[in-house]
Amino acid sequence: MRRKRGAAIRNCKLRGEWAEMCFAARALREGLRLARPWGESSGYDLVVDRGSREMVRVQVKSTIFREGTGYSCTMKDSKGPYKKNSFEFVAAYVIPEDVWFILPEETVRGKWSVGLYPKLENSKYGEYLEAWDLLRGELPGVIARIEACAEEYFPQS
């Protein structure tokens, strides 16, 4: 039902606001700490606090627009494609599939739109599908910390 509700919001501005709330809810479930800038002139929608005085800016985008077997997601503001250092990540919500792409800024910089293919293996942006670890500052496939405990084992005869 949630997918249909978001897609049913025809006003792009309202759908964008709804997507920002969806991002905040999901980010909190992922254990991320969020802050929101005051006003709408920042060039990004939310801030993820990574701790240790490190924060990253996130621009939230959403799409319902089919493009073949995927979706086209606009990557621009009212002035054109996003410029360098506007934010660190784009969180792109593919509403009909209920999935997120967490895209580093350099992958979308200067582009008018990107094609997102959640069901296609080896797609251009496939490595960023549900890549919430990037917002935490973790590298995919890298174990940041391991904790273990062991006891001596003496088999009974």
Language-model segment annotations:
Residues 1-42, 47-157:
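Mixed-charge (Asp/Glu-Lys/Arg
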